[in-house]
Amino acid sequence: MDNRYPIGQFNCPSEVQEKDIQMWIKEITTLPSRLHALTVSLDELELTKTYRENSWNVRQLIHHISDSHLNGYMRMKLALTEDNPVVKTYEESEWAKLIDYELPIRVSLQLLESLHERWTYLLKNLTATQLQRTYQYPDGSIMRIEQSIALYAWHGNHHLAHIQQALIRTK
């Protein structure tokens, strides 16, 4: 197993079924509680553990998930209100060096809980037409909202697995 991708790399589905969307929305919905359950009792030393050499630590992973999912939510809202908008990318590794990544993880866990409540309410109420709306990355690649739902469900599970790996590595 490649510990960079403990659940495998993301494979963007070309065709999406309604049952897939419902499963991904459920994963997005439950991510904050799954993260909270896994990390609520961690001490400072455990928060500094990494899942592999030179990787982000548990604290950085939690703050990153919050940042990334905030961006994902905004990308979807842009796609719903504009015609195939070009979305901005960001330097994730540089964001992880900013001072707010030193905050207690409860700050990002609270943000994720509120964000995911709004996000999943939106997702559960999208029409079939809205699920087909798109946004575009600066490189020209296009993502449908239904594919983006798959991406962020995978993303949350991907980093949850990283945190699990880091905590196993600490024992």
Swiss-Prot record:
Keywords attached to this entry: Cytoplasm, Hydrolase, Metal-binding, Zinc
Cofactor(s), names only, from the UniProt record: Zn(2+)
InterPro entries in the cross-refs: DinB-like, DinB/YfiT-like, Put_metal_dep_hydrolase_YfiT
Chief location category: cytoplasm
Enzyme Commission number(s) from the entry: 3.-.-.-
Intracellular or extracellular location(s): Cytoplasm
Binding-site positions, Zn(2+): 64, 155, 159
Co-factor binding comment: Binds 1 zinc ion per subunit.
Pfam name, any one: DinB_2
Gene Ontology, cellular component aspect: cytoplasm
Enzyme class: hydrolase
S-adenosyl-L-methionine among keywords: no
Family: Belongs to the metal hydrolase YfiT family.
Subunit record text: Homodimer.
Alphabetical list of HAMAP family matching this protein: YfiT_hydrol
Task performed by this protein: Possible metal-dependent hydrolase.
NCBIfam families, A to Z: PRK13291.1
Protein name per the record: Putative metal-dependent hydrolase BH0277
Protein's organism: Halalkalibacterium halodurans (strain ATCC BAA-125 / DSM 18197 / FERM 7344 / JCM 9153 / C-125)
